[in-house]
Swiss-Prot record:
Protein origin, superkingdom: Eukaryota
Originating organism: Homo sapiens
InterPro entries for this protein: GOST_TM, GPR107/GPR108-like, TMEM87A/B_GOLD
Gene: TMEM87A
Side of membrane Lumenal, spans: 22-225, 279-305, 347-361, 425-437
Classification lineage: Eukaryota, Metazoa, Chordata, Craniata, Vertebrata
Biased composition (Polar residues): 502-511
Protein name stated in the entry: Transmembrane protein 87A
Intrachain disulfide bonds: 74-128, 89-431
Protein's GO biological process: cellular response to mechanical stimulus; detection of mechanical stimulus involved in sensory perception of touch; retrograde transport, endosome to Golgi
N-terminal signal peptide: 1-21
Length: 555
């Protein structure tokens, strides 16, 4: 009773912890996942309605930020200013907003409330034609200023920093000096004495291209560990698929319905990991993401998680093992799976597109409540199914469900530990200094999902004794008939049976005479007309057995 009560209260505790939409790793990819890599190449039209361009990333040491300018000649004078700042805390990068660039630059100039170091430089161009030419910056540009009282470590470097591309020159303004989170800001000041010329040309000046290249091409320090992780997970799911196909091919005659569901989850997981890995490779070599691939990956992830939840629900209900059909419960299962697919797909698509962050957060809330309700339903169904198996004394199926329940409980316990760890390490700290481990916040949930999937594969693997887990009507009816006597024995266990004495009166003789009369009636008087007519029509023992079977069905 205590264990059952704990299982019912557990989903509520997980929801109150709050950081994740799914208490079970098998159901979830974790918190608001950032599985896809961020782009490292931008094309910004100037003017774009604002004079500032900025981004925040975790970069490798010696990562170079390139600028390229293309467009039509113009008579406007342009003042290009760069700022590159490192930070000791990832919070500074995460909380940075493009709308607050001017306020951030004021803090940077006053050296207050910020950590790390920064480089800055400014160059004036008399017209656009000069801007489009290959530029060479002197050592004054690489001047590095310490923040928060740090010692002056930067030295002026008189080496020219010029990069010549294949077609158009790329200006090389800045290079990172350590592995750290960085904020890069470009300010474009437009000034001209000819107001009319300025007004005419503002609508079509030029395009600025920003590229970030490091030791792994366009892949940043934040995304490189995730690319390796998805490559490994893609290999793992391929091995899962090969193993499951081999098992299924050996025992294809005795496959259960649930084993087809497990195969579908493996296939969708393989596709999901392959699409994510392909997206990381595209970012690495091209610097830009394919939005269609991102949406496809998120939809595949939503379908996989929805199918996984549906699989666990029908297993916990005992479908195909304890019950031949779900009946009315089937509609509830379908509605639950469809709702989860809707909310998870909507949340994932809105998150990767980045168009409606507030709407994505709103979609996350019902997803968390739905996931918690499903978890509650699963554990309640498991307890009821295990009680039924105990009553029927089906040791094989009961052992299977015990292992399955223990696996889910371990998954919940691991999820609680990871929720507490990620909350204390990444969310409630004032300075996220462990930014190298940020990728774990996303990877750990996918890894835990795969581990639980592997346990389920082992528990429900196809084998020669596959049918011992299947529902069989005859055996279930026999078990229901046989369970009554053991239950009576357990109920009266410890009680003594009083011996009965034969009464001296003549009741026993009367009872014996009645039994003899009943025996003669059963032997000589037919119970129905069919007992008299059918024997004359039967020609063989086989026909008698068929007739007996048909009569039993009619009764």
């Amino acid at each position: 009773m205590a264990a059952a009560a704990w299982l019912q209260v557990l989903p509520v505790i997980l929801l109150l912890l709050g950081a994740h939409p799914s208490p079970l790793s098998f159901f979830s990819a974790g918190p608001a996942t950032v599985a896809a890599a961020d782009r490292s190449k931008w094309h910004i039209p100037i003017p774009s309605g604002k004079n500032y361009f900025s981004f925040g990333k975790i970069l490798f040491r010696n990562t170079t930020i390139f600028l390229k300018f293309d467009g039509e000649p113009c008579d406007l004078s342009l003042n290009i200013t760069w700022y590159l700042k490192s930070a000791d805390c990832y919070n500074e990068i995460y909380n940075f907003k493009a709308e607050e660039v001017e306020l951030y630059l004021e803090k940077l100039k006053e050296k207050r409330g910020l950590s790390g170091k920064y480089q800055t430089s400014s160059k004036l161009f008399q017209n656009c034609s000069e801007l489009f030419k290959t530029q060479t910056f002197s050592g004054d540009f690489m001047h590095r200023l310490p923040l928060l009282g740090e010692k002056q470590e930067a030295k002026e470097n008189g080496t020219n920093l010029t990069f010549i591309g294949d077609k158009t020159a790329m200006h090389e303004p800045l290079q990172t000096w350590q592995d750290a989170p960085y904020i890069f800001i470009v300010h474009i000041g437009i000034s001209s004495s000819k107001e009319s010329s300025k007004e005419n040309s503002l609508s079509n000046l030029f395009t600025m291209t920003v590229e970030v290249k490091g030791p792994y091409e366009y892949l940043t320090l934040e995304d490189y560990p995730l690319m390796i992780f998805f490559m490994v997970m893609c290999i793992v799911y391929v091995l899962f698929g090969v193993l499951w196909l081999a098992w299924s091919a050996c025992y294809w005659r005795d496959l259960l319905r649930i084993q087809f569901w497990i195969g579908a989850v493996i296939f969708l997981g393989m596709l999901e990991k392959a699409v994510f890995y392909a997206e990381f490779q595209n970012i690495r070599y091209k610097g830009e993401s394919v939005q269609g691939a991102l949406i496809l990956a998120e939809l595949l992830s939503a379908v996989k998680r929805s199918l996984a939840r549906t699989l666990v629900i029908i297993v916990s209900l005992g479908y195909g093992i304890v019950k031949p059909r779900l009946g009315v419960t089937l509609h509830k299962v379908v509605v639950a799976g469809a709702l989860y697919l809707l909310f998870s797909g909507m949340e994932g698509v809105l998150r990767v597109t980045g168009a409606q962050t507030d709407l994505a957060s709103l979609a996350f809330i019902p997803l968390a409540f739905l996931d918690t309700a499903l978890c509650w339903w699963i554990f309640i169904s498991l307890t009821q199914t295990m009680k039924l198996l105990k009553l029927r004394r089906n040791i094989v199926k009961l052992s299977l469900y015990r292992h399955f329940t223990n696996t889910l409980i371990l998954a919940v316990a691991a999820s609680i530990v990871f929720i507490i760890w990620t909350t204390m390490k990444f969310r409630i700290v004032t300075c996220q200094s462990d930014w190298r481990e940020l990728w774990v916040d996303d990877a750990i949930w996918r890894l835990l999902f795969s581990m639980i999937l592997f346990v389920i594969m082992v528990l429900w693997r196809p084998s020669a004794n596959n049918q011992r887990f299947a529902f069989s009507p005859l055996s279930e009816e026999e078990e229901e008939d046989e369970q009554k006597e053991p239950m009576l024995k357990e109920s009266f266990e410890g009680m003594k049976m009083r011996s009965t004495k034969q009464e001296p009166n003549g009741n026993s003789k009367v009872n014996k005479a009645q039994e003899d009369d009943l025996k003669w009636v059963e032997e000589n008087v037919p119970s129905s007309v069919t007992d008299v007519a059918l024997p004359a029509l039967l020609d063989s023992d086989e026909e008698r057995m068929i007739t007996h079977f048909e009569r039993s069905k009619m009764e």
